[in-house]
């Protein structure tokens, strides 16, 4: 059975050896964080490297390929400066849906406001509406049905942020 903590610990040690002091952050996102992972789930890891280059991306791929269950690897890698300049609309959701393993994510992102969270919800609702209308017209019923789990996931993310706005409490799981 796949053990996420062991995977993350191994990955962390390998990345520290490769990037040295340039490794700023490693975090867990997705179904393993929410306790919803199945046998088929991938593991969503967020990595931040100072002054990231294309070579660093190649090194990251090389490291992942050395790990057991490398085919489960998924996630996001970025540079420290790029993250500091990230769109504030996404920061509340990012911070609340990522568990720190190495470094502290909240210290690496721009500040966000209630306005940003509301704008994120509004943008997400608009994108969801667009997707649903598009699929209704241009996709078969069978394909629409197969896409429902992804739609549910989008709705859940929207509801997380609405609940946060109304209560100040960010619910991490369904």
Where are these regions (language model features)?
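Ordered, amphipathic secondary-structure segments that act as subunit-interaction surfaces
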Residues: 85-107
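Conserved nucleotidyltransferase catalytic core and NTase-mimicking acidic/glycine-rich helix/loop elements
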Residues: 111-174
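Short acidic, glycine/Ser/Thr-rich loop/turn "cap" segments at secondary-structure junctions
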Residues: 75-80, 106-110, 139
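A general structural signal for short secondary-structure boundary/capping elements
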Residues: 73-76, 89-96, 122-123, 141
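Metal-dependent nucleotidyltransferase catalytic core
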Residues: 1-18, 34-40, 46-88
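Short gly/ser-rich loop at a beta-strand->alpha-helix junction or flexible surface loop bordering the NTP-binding
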Residues: 23-32
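Short, polar/flexible loop-turn hinges at active-site or ligand-entry regions and domain interfaces
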Residues: 49-55, 102-112
